[in-house]
Amino acid sequence: MLALLLLAGRVPAATLVIHVQGADGRVLPGAVVTARPLEGGAHRPAPQHAVMDQVDRAFVPDLLVLPVGSAIEFPNSDAVSHQIYSFSPAKRFQLPLYRGKPYPPVLFEQAGVVTLGCNIHDEMLAYVVVTEAPYFGRTDAAGTYTGEVVRGRYRVAIWHPRLREEAADLERELTVGETDRAELTLRLSRPLLPAPLGNRPHSWDY
């Protein structure tokens, strides 16, 4: 279970602030936050065009959060060849051995978490979180996500590559109501999974 603190809000446009903490109470940077309206009328986020490069045998950036329908270019800036793949249900694809930028952008049409790897370099790891939520982002170094939302009821969810909980345990509802700011603090009930031994640093390290 997640402990939560809610201070609700009043105008049609309001500031939503989400604080995410680990089970030990420390702030959790790099977590993905999504806020989905529970009532109709919300806008659907426009697809984006993103780039995930390969530099020094690592994905750069190593985690992207994008709306459904977005496309990602996967250039290879290394002097060695890479072979990117994903077996995730939300997007299965493979880009055979290449350097430079020989392939067109990959389209991500389905919501879900897509795990990326390289068939040549096992240490390479990245994630793409594809969402239908109109409001999304990642927590900063202080474990906080801040966004502007319209007044209403929302389901807020968090995701992190090392979470143990099931998805249902990581969602909470809140109302942005009568003030111009709403805050929610989410604290994990269990420690994160340990980082893989010998793995290189990532943007979601804790």
Question: Over which residues does each language-model region extend?
Answer:
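Extracytoplasmic copper-binding redox domains, predominantly the cupredoxin/blue-copper superfamily
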Residues: 13-142, 146-206
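Bacterial N-terminal signal peptides
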Residues: 1-8
